[in-house]
Amino acid sequence: KQKSAYLAGSMRALRSLDREAPDRDLRDALTALPGVGPKTASWVVRNWRDSDCVSILDIHILRAGRMLQIFPEGKSVERHYLELEAAFLDFAEAISVKASILDSVMWMNMRQIPAAILRRLADPSAEVFSPKAEPVQLSLAL
């Protein structure tokens, strides 16, 4: 029921949206739509306009950004999206890589790393795996 209300409200609001607005302004306008957050709005702008003025931040990009020390600990995409996005875009510019390429590569690589390895990277004292059974001594003697 709530989704249908969001959709109906969004459809009405889309009619008055300035589709010629600069990329960030368009993203911000999209976040005013019911049920649309900055990640979704950035995804729309990035893919509709092939924009490198916004970035699509999620947990994978956040983890990679923390590993590279471009995102400080304690910041979340839910509460600090624009601050993290600014840091990400500055980093992309500093290394002369399009933001769209950088977040795509980071996302593809980070999502393939097993959770146990990510825990170990975040906390060097964390166990990489927990054995389920006692190890068995094998013998090759005939």
What are these regions (language model features)?
Residues K1-P34:
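Alpha-helical ds-nucleic-acid-binding substructure associated with the helix-hairpin-helix region
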Residues Q2, A21, D25, I56, ...:
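Alpha-helix N-cap and coil->helix boundary residues
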Residues L7, I61, L102:
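A residue-level signal for conserved active-site and pocket-lining positions in enzyme catalytic cores
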Residues R12, E78-L142:
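A basic, often C-terminal nucleic-acid-binding module that engages the phosphate backbone, implemented
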Residues L14-A21, D50-C53, I70-F71, M110-L118:
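Short helix-capping/linker segments at secondary-structure and domain boundaries
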Residues V45-I95:
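Phosphate-backbone recognition surface of nucleic-acid-processing proteins
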